[in-house]
């Protein structure tokens, strides 16, 4: 089985790194295409067996499984020239949220990875990939997609565009929102003490990491954790009272 990746932006690079690092397929069967060839030349230094090209049609003609990782407005532009070369025995997977594109010849699987799944040897499986298959995707092809992405992330399969949109916000958009929040808090704390922003940022990042671990491992529920930290009329409780008056949609 030949596996092709079209597009080497942030997500295309993330997928390539994980597929290579997790030995998901024989690298002599991995094809990576990008419009700017110089951006992927270094992959030959990682392993000379990897095939690189700037010709998407070459990937369509050669690969049974094709992942298209481009910006959402470019998906149809990239896919249309490939259609004459795609057969019902192939599989198309794309990473573009917010599209209702259909491809009845072999079906489409939409997978929204998260930058949280960037490869890390010490923690090779993290983040959540959101998956939605259309009705034309076979059971075998569904299994392939879910097996691939479960190598380096948790997976959540959804059945409707609305669920895909909301889950995408939670899994794929949220790292940026969290990063901004931590950065803003670090800046505010720096202004009120003698610690540098770098120091306050590290404190917040480590606190976020350890709190996430407690919640993920069900050591405490959110309510239990809050009760462990907050005391009546204390500064934490006063902050919680302010936040609790604002519905989550306004935060």
Curated annotation (Swiss-Prot):
Signal sequence, start to end: none
GO biological process: L-proline biosynthetic process
Source superkingdom: Archaea
Keywords: Amino-acid biosynthesis, Cytoplasm, NADP, Oxidoreductase, Proline biosynthesis
Record's catalysed reaction(s): L-proline + NADP(+) = (S)-1-pyrroline-5-carboxylate + NADPH + 2 H(+); L-proline + NAD(+) = (S)-1-pyrroline-5-carboxylate + NADH + 2 H(+)
Pathway: Amino-acid biosynthesis; L-proline biosynthesis; L-proline from L-glutamate 5-semialdehyde: step 1/1
Molecular-function GO term, any one: pyrroline-5-carboxylate reductase activity
Listed EC numbers: 1.5.1.2
Subcellular location: Cytoplasm
An example Gene Ontology CC term for this record: cytoplasm
Coiled-coil spans in chain: none
Membership in a protein family: Belongs to the pyrroline-5-carboxylate reductase family.
UniProt function note: Catalyzes the reduction of 1-pyrroline-5-carboxylate (PCA) to L-proline.
Protein name per the record: Pyrroline-5-carboxylate reductase
UniProt organism field: Methanobrevibacter smithii
């Amino acid at each position: 089985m030949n596996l092709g990746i079209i597009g080497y932006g942030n997500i295309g690079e993330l997928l390539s790194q994980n597929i290579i690092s997790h030995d998901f397929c024989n690298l002599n069967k991995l094809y990576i295409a990008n419009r700017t060839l110089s951006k992927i030349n270094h992959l030959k230094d990682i392993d000379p067996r990897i095939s690189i090209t700037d010709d998407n049609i070459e990937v369509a003609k050669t690969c049974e499984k094709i992942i298209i990782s481009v910006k959402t407005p470019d998906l149809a532009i990239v896919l249309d020239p490939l259609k004459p070369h795609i057969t019902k025995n192939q599989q198309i997977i794309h990473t573009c949220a917010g599209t209702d594109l259909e491809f009845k010849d072999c079906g489409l699987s939409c997978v929204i990875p998260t930058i949280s799944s960037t490869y890390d040897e010490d923690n090779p499986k993290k983040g959540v990939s959101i998956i939605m298959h259309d009705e034309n995707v076979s059971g075998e092809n569904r299994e392939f997609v879910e097996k691939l992405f479960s190598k380096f992330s948790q997976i959540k399969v959804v059945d409707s565009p609305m669920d895909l949109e909301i889950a995408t916000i939670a899994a794929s958009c949220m790292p940026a929102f969290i990063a901004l929040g931590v950065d803003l808090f670090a800046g505010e704390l720096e202004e009120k003490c003698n610690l540098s922003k770098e120091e306050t940022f590290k404190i917040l990042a480590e606190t976020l990491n350890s709190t996430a671990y407690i919640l993920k491992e069900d050591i405490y529920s959110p309510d239990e954790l809050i009760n462990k930290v907050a005391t009546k009329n204390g500064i934490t409780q006063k902050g919680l009272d302010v936040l609790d008056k604002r519905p989550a949609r306004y935060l």
